[in-house]
Amino acid sequence: ADEVNKEVNSWVEEQTNGLITDLLPPNSASPLTDLIFANALFFNGRWDSQFNPSLTKESDFHLLDGTKVRVPFMTGAHEDSLDVYEGFKVLNLPYREGREDSRGFSMQIYLPDEKDGLPSMLESLASTRGFLKDNKVLPSQKAGVKELKIPRFKFAFDFEALKALKVLGLKVPLSTIIHKSCIEVDEVGSKAAAAAALRSCGGCYFPPKKYDFVADHPFLFIVKEYISGLVLFLGHVMDPSKH
């Protein structure tokens, strides 16, 4: 069983360029295990317009409980797309990857106007059908970016997904589904990976108006292929000081 664990984890580590090293926890395979399915997704995206590392400075990030942490913030004069909605703004950071084969990848950062506004923003988005795939379902105003500050962040998340699938009404002939995701965002771009094991027993025009986009409080991020609307990674940053 230990050899099975090592073999699966070694394969996942190789496929995700070392971002995920321990998908299967110890003793997850046993003599009663008949079958293990494993898949992995790795995304390494370079910003179309990279941040200058020499401009990265430490600043305060405000947590939901009212406390603050000091973290490195990337900054720069990017001519990026900004959509202004009631109560929040969405910054679109395109990647270079995919331009040559008629695809387009980007990271969208959803920043609530209020420092403690993430829960209410998530509730509003969850109640708006199809918004994450097509942002045009809500009225917005196009704008430019005046001051841009985004924290560097890196974190991993894992959970047992079988219960969630059962809640959705899916009948899965498996005893366990382990899902783990990892993402790292810095001045060059972002590296993201996701893995799962299943065990059975261009240029834009901006209006003159510009807004600051200072992500110094909890926000939502999405990595997507924006031509099809396919969401590759989704998460929220609560405390960028924690890895």
Regions found by a protein language model. Give the residues of each.
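Feature captures eukaryotic membrane-trafficking machinery centered on endolysosomal pathways
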Residues: 92-94, 208-243
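Active/binding-pocket-proximal capping segment
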Residues: 127, 198-202, 237-242
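Non-catalytic, conformational "gating/processing" segments within enzyme and secreted inhibitor domains
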Residues: 1-121, 131-210
